[in-house]
A protein has these predicted regions:
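Metal-dependent nuclease catalytic regions and adjoining charged, substrate-binding loops involved
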Residues: 2-7, 135-292
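A residue-level signal for conserved active-site and pocket-lining positions in enzyme catalytic cores
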Residues: 36, 67, 132, 190, ...
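Broad hydrophobic/π-residue packing in well-ordered secondary structure
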Residues: 40-42, 109, 125, 132, ...
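Short, well-structured alpha-helical interface segments that form or flank functional binding sites
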Residues: 93, 124-131, 185, 264
Length: 292
C-alpha cells in the first residue's frame, strides 16, 4: 500500500502509519470477516496499488497507541494474545486485547465516535467478540462474557449537560454474555463466509457481487413531503406512494427525493477506485472547467 503525505506530516509519523499487509497470505482476521467479499478480494488483489494518506490515519494511530499503553500494564490477565483456527484452506485469526482467565471475560479496547453509542450500533462489535470467543474455545479457553471498552474521541461535555440521552462520560462499555448457541451460530457464520469468499476469488473484479447494503453502510432513499414557504419537511416517507398520499392529506406542494447513500463506499473503503459498483453508483463525475 502506498502512503501519501498531502499535509506534509513529519516523516516519523508517516513512517509509523505506513501500512503493511493486514492479513498474511491464506489468513482472514476476525475483523476482515466483517467486510464484504468484494472488498476483501479487491484489497488483496490490488494491495500494492492502493493509496492512503497519512493525515487520514491520525485516529487509528491513537487507537494503536492506546492499545500499546494498556498492553504494558501489569495485572493478572493476559493481553494481545493471538489465536487461530484452520477452516478449509484459510486460517482464521484474532488478537485478543485482554482476557481475564479467572472470570473468563474477554475485553477489547475501542476508540470510536460518540455517534456509535447514540445509534446503538454494536452489531459489528458483537460479531467480532463472538469470533474471538469461538477462536478461544477451539484453543481450549472458555469465554463467558465479551466486554468492549470504548473511548469516545468526539465526546462533548457541553452536549452531555444539555442532553440526558447523550453519553455522559467519554467512556462507554458494551458487554454481552456468550452462550453455546452464540458459538454454534458463529461457527456457521464463519464457515458460510469463508465459502463465499473462496467463490469470490474465482471471479474477476467486476464479476464479484457488490457488498450488501449493511456492508456498504447504505441508507435508503427517502421522500420528503414539502410545502412552499416552509424549510423543513411536513413528513419524510420511505416510498413515493406513501409520500404522495401524505402530500395529498397534509397539503404539501411537492415531493423532494433524497437519494440513499453508500457511506462506506463514498468515504471509507480503501479499494473503492478498483470497484465497479463504486464507479457506477457512488463516484461523482469530475467537473470539467471550461476556459473563459
Amino acid at each position: 500500500m502506498i502512503t501519501t503525505n498531502k499535509m506534509h506530516m513529519p516523516q516519523a509519523f508517516v513512517n509509523f502509519v505506513s501500512n503493511t499487509r493486514h492479513n498474511a497470505p491464506g489468513t482472514l482476521s476476525a475483523t476482515t470477516l466483517l467486510q464484504g467479499d468484494k472488498q476483501i478480494v479487491l484489497f488483496d488483489r490490488h494491495f500494492d496499488e492502493l493509496e492512503q494518506d497519512a493525515a487520514d490515519l491520525v485516529w487509528p494511530t491513537f487507537g494503536t497507541a492506546f492499545h500499546s499503553v494498556m498492553e504494558k500494564q501489569n495485572d493478572d490477565a493476559f493481553k494481545e494474545e493471538a489465536f487461530s483456527v484452520q477452516v478449509d484452506r484459510w486460517k482464521v485469526t484474532g488478537r485478543v486485547d485482554r482476557y481475564d482467565l479467572e472470570n473468563e471475560v474477554l475485553e477489547d479496547w475501542k476508540t470510536t465516535s460518540v455517534w456509535k453509542v447514540i445509534y446503538g450500533d454494536f452489531k459489528d462489535w458483537k460479531a467480532q467478540g463472538l469470533t474471538y470467543a469461538w477462536l478461544m474455545k477451539q484453543n481450549g479457553l472458555n469465554v463467558q462474557k465479551c466486554r468492549f471498552v470504548a473511548l469516545l474521541k468526539d465526546h462533548s461535555k457541553t452536549e452531555a449537560k444539555r442532553k440526558p440521552d447523550y453519553p455522559q462520560k467519554p467512556v462507554f462499555i458494551y458487554e454481552f454474555d456468550v452462550t453455546e448457541a452464540d458459538l454454534e451460530e458463529t461457527e456457521e457464520r464463519i464457515r458460510t463466509k469463508i465459502k463465499s469468499i473462496t467463490e469470490a476469488y474465482k471471479l474477476g473484479d467486476d464479476d464479484i457481487a457488490p457488498c450488501t447494503d449493511e456492508e456498504r453502510w447504505a441508507t435508503a432513499t427517502k421522500y420528503a413531503v414539502m410545502k412552499d414557504g416552509r424549510k423543513t419537511a411536513l413528513k419524510v416517507c420511505d416510498s413515493m406512494t406513501d409520500a404522495e398520499a401524505c402530500k395529498e392529506a397534509m397539503g404539501g406542494t411537492r415531493i423532494e427525493v433524497r437519494p440513499g447513500e453508500s457511506k462506506k463506499c463514498a468515504d471509507y473503503c480503501p479499494c473503492a477506485e478498483f470497484c465497479n459498483f463504486y464507479r457506477d453508483n457512488v463516484k461523482k463525475p469530475e467537473t470539467e472547467t471550461v476556459p473563459m
